[in-house]
Design a protein with these regions (language model features):
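Short, glycine/charged-enriched secondary-structure capping and boundary segments
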Residues: 2-5, 59-60, 91-94, 128-130
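Hydrophobic, aromatic-enriched interface-forming segments
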Residues: 63-95
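Active-site neighborhood of phospho(di)ester-bond hydrolases with catalytic His/Asp-centered motifs
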Residues: 46, 76-81, 113-117
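Short beta-strand scaffold segments in enzyme catalytic cores
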Residues: 37-40, 85-89, 130-134
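Acidic, His/Gly-rich catalytic cores of divalent-metal-dependent hydrolytic chemistry
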Residues: 92-174
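Active-site neighborhood of divalent metal-dependent phosphoester bond hydrolases
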Residues: 1-73
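Active-site environment of divalent metal-dependent phosphoester hydrolases
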Residues: 1, 51-53, 78-90, 105, ...
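Short, structured patches in soluble enzyme cores that scaffold and shape functional sites
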Residues: 47-50, 82, 145-147
């Protein structure tokens, strides 16, 4: 719900309100109409975890990944909420695996969740933008890192009157 920021930290609430106040009603309506889940035969794309709202959460631990996998309907799922590029793999009867990765041929008969990282607000000690390139033919995923003008981005944050901690996070990558 684009009008409900009651369940977020104060810093996030400030940014949420700032952004909301700058969007036109038609833009808010369009954002509200977007699907919460994009699902194909082969993969799904979500914001946080596959757990139903409001229980969805950051997938940052094996316990949280295990909960996520209870609701994942495809072998492969991409998510972004944690802002950390990571890989979680689940095969029934085996220990759940979580790790960082750069290049990976995705295994068959295993559920895989890939955290795609972030463009801005990184949380993995690396200020560069992160994205995942998924090759459907090779069934592979590659982590891409791109430098951008962090100082200019920090200046825009501060000039907008947003919390200074948001600007410093860009340099620190946390």
């Amino acid at each position: 719900n684009l009008n409900d920021n009651s369940n977020v930290r104060e810093e996030a609430s400030t940014v949420f309100s700032w952004t909301h106040d700058r969007l036109r009603p038609d833009q808010l309506q369009w954002l509200g109409s977007l699907p919460k889940v994009i699902q194909t035969d082969n993969f799904m794309v979500i914001h946080s975890s596959c757990q139903p709202y409001p229980n969805c959460t950051y997938v940052t631990s094996a316990n949280r990944a295990a909960l996520h996998f209870l609701f994942q309907k495809t072998d492969l799922c991409f998510n972004a909420h944690s802002h950390v590029p990571l890989l979680a793999m689940h095969r029934p009867g085996h220990q759940l695996t979580m790790k960082y990765f750069h290049n990976l041929i995705l295994p068959r008969n295993v559920q895989v969740m890939i955290g795609v990282g972030a463009v801005g607000q990184p949380r993995d000690d690396d200020p560069r933008a992160a994205a995942i390139l998924y090759n459907t033919t090779a069934n592979s995923a590659t982590l891409l890192r791109v430098k951008y003008d962090v100082e200019a981005a920090k200046k825009r944050i501060l000039d907008a009157g947003l919390p200074a901690s948001l600007a410093s996070r860009l340099t620190l990558g946390k």
